[in-house]
Curated annotation (Swiss-Prot):
It comes from the Bacteria. Coiled coil: none annotated. It comes from Thermosipho africanus (strain TCF52B). HAMAP family: RemA. Belongs to the RemA family. InterPro entries: RemA-like. This is Putative regulatory protein THA_332.
Amino acid sequence: MFGLINIGFGNVIAGDRIVAIVNPESAPLKRLKEDAKEEGKLIDATYGRKTRAILISDSNHIILSAIQPETIAQRFMQSFFEIEEQLDKIRRKG
């Protein structure tokens, strides 16, 4: 229950579909990025800037972002808390 999450430059993703947000510096993640590119499952949302985070979706799509993983994680948590607040309001009315 995360809704849409801003990953930079006006790009948003469906938060419920993301299974991991990782730092792109390790060799295995670089290979994962190359494999996704070959399979047509790479989504580059960096606008030509340095990749600072790799997001992995439940459909094995790899999304590149120029935003730090910590910042994206904070946005996930903020979205979660906002949805929880809305649900609390609905529960209190009902």
